[in-house]
Design a protein with these regions (language model features):
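Basic nucleic-acid-binding interfaces
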Residues: 1-152
Length: 152
């Protein structure tokens, strides 16, 4: 994957971050219409700020994104903006969620962030394949499906 340097009026930059954040209480609510709405909302909010979503994937209980954030913004301010504004927009579109979450806070506090250097292709591949990895992991670790009366 070619390394793309971005430009501002007096700056050349390449600031990419792998970010993971979750709904409040890590509830598995990101599916169907809510999933497509969250994707659309995050794309729109990033476009407003000039942030590029290089890769992104919405899991039922968390969101993975690879973002190119201009150096004029801190990661903390971008995440506050994305999580705050998207919460309001999600509750506007899905008013029934207020009973599950209350206080118009859809996202949990905090997030995971790591910088992406020259291993951008590896991180993008990880984000793309995260869902299939989680499904395989769940199949291996689901104890409820085992017969409790079977001798070992």
């Amino acid at each position: 994957m070619a390394q793309k340097a971005y430009s501002l009026s007096h700056t050349k930059w390449m600031c990419k971050y792998h970010i993971v954040f979750t709904p409040k209480y890590r509830r598995k609510v990101i599916y169907n219409q809510i999933r497509s709405d969250i994707g659309e909302i995050l794309r729109k909010l990033c476009e407003y700020k000039g942030i590029e979503i290089i890769e992104g994937h919405l899991m039922p209980d968390h969101v993975h994104v690879l973002l190119a954030i201009p150096p004029k913004y801190s990661v903390a301010s971008v995440m506050g903006y994305l999580k705050g504004k998207s919460s309001l927009m999600i509750f506007d579109r899905h008013a029934n969620l207020k009973y599950k979450f209350g206080n118009r806070k859809f996202w949990a506090e905090g997030y995971y962030v790591s910088t992406v250097g020259l291993n951008e292709a590896t991180i993008a591949k990880y984000i793309r394949e995260q869902e299939s990895h989680d499904i395989a992991l769940n199949k291996l670790s689901v104890k409820e499906c085992e017969d409790p009366f079977k001798r070992r």
